[in-house]
């Protein structure tokens, strides 16, 4: 049960929380007391040389991430975790391993599992599998055939509602970039956040001109639903414009640094956040090459952590090919120049 204490010691469950906040005309200001705010690190997925899952390596990596004080949640089976190369059974296996490892750390860290499916029934089944494996929520991606063909507004809203109605697990809506045919409109998201099981929007719109406008209007409709940035390349600007946290692959790469930076921004400590940004910026250029997360980012993350002795292997699953030796040498040189300690 979702419970929160607000002014005058009144305790509300989630079913009445939105109405109470609307009557007060304000939001709960202490973000640290909220269940879906802060830093949610998207995790990498290690493979053996034969392309099988590296289970011991995954446990070791997740254990390290749990040691980042202040990490609010871990997100497996995202794009950073190469969900598209994992079978449904492997996605559930990865979720179970992450949930078991988090449970062993004896600190409350939420487990979120990505769901990518082409239809409502398949997505519901995958969401239930994640729930059964120990996930606290799912990250619901839009069906990828929308990227090519688009969709009707009723289809977009209906897809989220179908899964939220039937899966019996909290839902994080993954907003894709505005330039794709799979991104949601503001009106569509306003419908989605009204659903009881929708707890967060991972706001990947990448339209900075609309960021604050959309944030304020979504919070007006559903103040208890977190709006978090996934803009690794615009992390500090989006946090300062208006965000309740960050759900990013970069936090699965440099967890302690990213927790420190996001927390400073959420606390309003601009000087500390900008100091962190001085270290984050060159790392982001190394991983993202001045752009948004793309097809090669998780490769560079894996190789960089492996070169630093912080990841079990640099292996990928086909059709992804290994980085060239020149690319590996470039990463090695950049890491040496930056003298980074993750």
Q: Could you tell me what each predicted segment is?
A:
Residues 3-10, 20-22:
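Acidic, Ala/Val/Gly-enriched low-complexity intrinsically disordered segments
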Residues 21, 27-29, 38-44, 64, ...:
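C-terminal alpha-helical cap/extension of soluble enzyme domains
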Residues 24-183, 321:
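Active-site beta->alpha loop and helix N-cap motifs at the rims of alpha/beta catalytic domains
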Residues 43, 78, 142-143, 205, ...:
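Short secondary-structure boundary segments
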Residues 58, 95, 123, 160, ...:
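A general structural signal for well-ordered alpha-helical segments in protein cores
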Residues 101-109, 134, 167-169, 194-197, ...:
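Short helix-capping segments at alpha-helix termini
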Residues 177-284:
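Catalytic alpha/beta core domains of metabolic enzymes, predominantly
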């Amino acid at each position: 049960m979702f419970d929160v204490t607000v002014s005058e010691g009144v305790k509300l469950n989630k079913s009445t929380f939105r109405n109470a906040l609307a009557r007060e005309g304000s939001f709960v200001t202490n973000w640290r007391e909220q269940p879906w705010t802060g830093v949610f690190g998207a995790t990498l997925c290690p493979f053996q040389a034969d392309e099988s899952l590296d289970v011991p390596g995954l446990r070791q990596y997740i254990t390290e991430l749990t040691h980042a004080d202040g990490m609010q949640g871990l997100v497996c089976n995202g794009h950073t975790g190469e969900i598209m190369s994992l079978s449904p059974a492997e996605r559930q296996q990865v979720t179970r391993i992450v949930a078991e490892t988090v449970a062993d750390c004896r600190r409350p860290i939420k487990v979120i599992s990505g769901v990518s499916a082409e239809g409502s029934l398949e997505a519901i089944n995958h969401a239930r599998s994640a729930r059964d494996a120990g996930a606290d929520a799912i990250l619901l991606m839009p069906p990828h055939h929308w990227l090519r063909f688009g969709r009707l507004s009723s289809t977009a809203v209906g897809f989220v509602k179908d899964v939220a109605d039937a899966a019996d697990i909290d839902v994080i809506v993954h907003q894709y970039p505005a330039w794709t045919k799979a991104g949601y409109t503001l009106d569509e998201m306003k419908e989605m956040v009204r659903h009881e099981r929708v707890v967060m929007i991972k706001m990947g719109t990448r339209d900075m001109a609309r960021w604050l406008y959309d944030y304020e209007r979504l919070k007006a409709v559903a103040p208890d639903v977190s709006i978090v940035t996934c803009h690794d390349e615009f992390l500090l600007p989006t946090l300062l414009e208006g965000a309740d946290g960050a759900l990013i692959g970069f936090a699965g790469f440099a967890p302690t640094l990213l927790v420190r930076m996001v927390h400073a921004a959420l606390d309003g400590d601009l000087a500390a956040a900008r100091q962190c940004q001085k270290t984050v910026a060159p790392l982001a250029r190394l991983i993202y090459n001045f752009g948004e997360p793309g097809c090669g980012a998780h490769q560079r993350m894996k190789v960089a952590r492996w070169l630093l002795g912080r990841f079990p292997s640099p292996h990928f699953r086909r059709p992804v090919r290994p980085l060239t030796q020149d690319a590996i040498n470039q990463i090695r040189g950049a890491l040496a120049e930056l003298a980074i300690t993750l």
